[in-house]
């Protein structure tokens, strides 16, 4: 079974290969740790993000003994988890290795974010000696109780499967089940391995390859037919239907099928903000990002005036709904989940796979270009490009005009929580240009680790990472790991003196941060080892020069460009969004 054929920016797919005779491994290769390393590689992981600790050192020895598995040592566990998240976004699966409790509880926040984004991250923890379980002994790296299950209980809410390996006899089964569950459910899993077991051989690790247990999910044919019939009846009555792609297109592996329906139907196609990059933006009927009051120009008018809208894998939370202010009506909506379809707030059809539903619908839908023709009528091209005067302080809008010119199928964009969300949403992505951000969880600082992981998974692309100064202060250390591993990312550090997104939701003195010498910090981290170039820019002409240097002379280096802008220079979309989210947060308690 070959499980290493993974779609770019998607979830791992498993492909059956011709049966091969089982290979019997020698005892040195038949250890628990070597078995785990082989299974990770077979699942698609060729890099692991690690922080050593005394409980995982023997395990790390076994993992890195596999020449197909590359160890990426991180500065802290949180960033290791974020890196595994970013890696999974590109490769379809990622893995991190930390030590018991002090490492596990540190990585927990990153695993929660991966869970919210439906990413199969395999979190591996080096646990206590198997002989210490059930002895009432108190160990270091714990909270001082003889019960060692606190870490496990914390992970139970943010992983879809937990394996605690204290015995060699069932280790093979537990590890395989954990990895298979992560791939099947597209959620993180937790594997704890006792520190004294990793280097011990066992007969169950000696035969390989052994297929993963990955039963494919299929639609119930009757349910699929009923869902398609009900949907066609609803759509054929509509005058101006539209399509909107949501973030669960990824976990449903339905992006191609969604585009097939767009081609067949002629409907205008929009995406929710957290699905940007999932639909080709060069599609002839693409109209932009639907985000309520902060949508792409003319997009919300078309979506909200439609008499039928197909939402594919949406997540409607307070952020994506702009403080619950979307002007949508459930009775006009067809909501397509990964495994079910809801038609016009009425019947729900279960056991229906999203990809199969869209493909079947594409074969039978009646083309209708009315809504797209309406969009074409009201669309007004963008006006004259903004240009700063010489030595005039750089403005964010002018900056992103130059960023747009950098994009190609050989680049990818990582947008940090904050105003980068809104500025990067306005970028027009060429075909093949990657795009990632973390909207559901919105953990500031995520992008540093995610950039590390995504760039490691996709060395053929140059990653452009946009990070605010406040977010960067949370996780800055792992720029070190990027340099150490020869990555060629371009980081744009937006220095506006504080937590701008929080300012627009609710201002206060706590949103002002201590200014750092950011380029000086990165120079200190660089310390003459590896390839790294830094610069500060205050004016448009300096930005143009910096981009030219980064893309030509320093194209093989990590480039760190600190962009200094006024603290109040924010996108108009953030101003509108912030006021609505603030209003939603500030609602008084309901009467009792």
UniProtKB/Swiss-Prot annotation:
Keywords: Decarboxylase, Lyase, Magnesium, Metal-binding, Pyruvate, Stress response, Thiamine pyrophosphate. Expressed at low levels in roots and shoots. Induction: By wounding and paraquat. Not induced by anoxia. Substrate binds at residues 54, 141, 502. The keyword Cytoplasm does not apply. The keyword Magnesium applies. Residues 419-501 are annotated as: Thiamine pyrophosphate binding. It catalyses: a 2-oxocarboxylate + H(+) = an aldehyde + CO2. Its EC number is 4.1.1.1. Mg(2+) binds at residues 469, 496, 498. Binds 1 metal ion per subunit. Binds 1 thiamine pyrophosphate per subunit. Pfam families: TPP_enzyme_C, TPP_enzyme_M, TPP_enzyme_N. Its cofactor is a metal cation; thiamine diphosphate. CDD domains: TPP_PDC_IPDC, TPP_PYR_PDC_IPDC_like. One of its GO terms (molecular function) is magnesium ion binding. Homotetramer. Belongs to the TPP enzyme family. PANTHER family: PYRUVATE DECARBOXYLASE, PYRUVATE DECARBOXYLASE 3-RELATED. This is Pyruvate decarboxylase 3. It comes from Arabidopsis thaliana (Mouse-ear cress).
């Amino acid at each position: 079974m070959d499980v290493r054929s993974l779609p770019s920016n998607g979830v791992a797919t498993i492909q059956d290969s011709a049966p091969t005779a089982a290979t019997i491994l020698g005892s040195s290769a038949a250890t628990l740790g070597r078995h785990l390393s082989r299974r990770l590689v077979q699942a698609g992981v060729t890099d692991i993000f690690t922080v050593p600790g005394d409980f995982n050192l023997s395990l790390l020895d076994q993992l890195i003994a596999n020449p197909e598995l590359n160890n990426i040592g991180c500065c802290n566990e949180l960033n290791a988890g974020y890196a595994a998240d970013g890696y999974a976004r590109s490769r379809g699966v990622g893995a991190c290795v930390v030590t018991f409790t002090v490492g596990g509880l540190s990585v927990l926040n990153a695993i929660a974010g991966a869970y919210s984004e439906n990413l199969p991250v395999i979190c591996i923890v080096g646990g206590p000696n198997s002989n210490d379980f059930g002895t009432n002994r108190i160990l270091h790296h714990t909270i001082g109780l003889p019960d060692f299950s606190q870490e496990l209980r914390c992970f139970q809410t943010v992983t879809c499967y937990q394996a605690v390996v204290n015995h060699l006899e069932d280790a093979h089964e537990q590890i395989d089940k954990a990895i298979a569950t992560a791939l099947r459910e597209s959620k993180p899993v937790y594997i704890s391995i006792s520190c004294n077991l990793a280097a011990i051989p066992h007969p169950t690790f000696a035969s390989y390859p052994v297929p993963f247990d990955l039963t494919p999910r299929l639609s119930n044919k009757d349910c699929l037919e009923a869902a398609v019939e009900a949907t066609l009846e609803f759509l054929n009555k509509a005058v101006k239907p539209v399509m909107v792609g949501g973030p669960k297109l990824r976990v449903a592996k339905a992006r191609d099928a969604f585009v097939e329906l767009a081609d067949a139907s002629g409907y205008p196609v929009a995406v929710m903000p957290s699905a940007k990059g999932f639909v080709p933006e060069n599609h002839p009927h693409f109209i932009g990002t639907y985000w309520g009051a902060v949508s792409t120009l003319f997009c919300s008018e078309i979506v909200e005036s439609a008499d039928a809208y197909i939402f594919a894998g949406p997540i409607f939370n307070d952020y994506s709904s702009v403080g619950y202010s979307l002007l949508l009506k459930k009775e006009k909506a067809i909501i397509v989940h990964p495994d079910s379809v809801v038609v016009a707030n009425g019947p729900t059809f279960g056991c229906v796979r999203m990809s199969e539903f869209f493909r079947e619908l594409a074969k039978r839908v009646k083309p209708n270009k009315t809504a797209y023709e309406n969009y074409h009528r009201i669309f007004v091209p963008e006006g004259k490009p903004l240009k700063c005067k010489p030595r005039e302080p750089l403005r964010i809008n002018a900056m992103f005009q130059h960023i747009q010119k950098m994009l190609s199928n050989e680049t990818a964009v990582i947008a940090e929580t904050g105003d980068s969300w809104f500025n990067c949403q306005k970028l027009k992505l060429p075909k093949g240009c990657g795009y990632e951000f973390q909207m559901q969880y919105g953990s500031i600082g995520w992008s540093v680790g995610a950039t590390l992981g995504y760039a490691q998974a996709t060395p053929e692309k140059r990653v452009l990472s946009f990070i605010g100064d406040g977010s960067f202060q949370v996780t800055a250390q792992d720029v070190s790991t990027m340099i150490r591993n020869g990555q060629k990312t371009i980081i744009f550090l937006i220095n506006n003196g504080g937590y701008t997104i929080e300012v627009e939701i609710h201002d206060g003195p706590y949103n002002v941060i201590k200014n750092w010498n950011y380029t000086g910090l990165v120079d200190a981290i660089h310390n003459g080892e590896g390839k790294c170039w830094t610069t500060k820019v205050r004016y448009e002409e300096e930005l143009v020069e910096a981009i030219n240097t980064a893309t030509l002379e320093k194209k093989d280096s990590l480039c760190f460009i600190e962009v200094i802008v006024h603290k109040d220079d924010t996108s108009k979309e953030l101003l509108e969004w912030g006021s609505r989210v603030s209003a939603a947060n500030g609602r008084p308690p309901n009467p009792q």
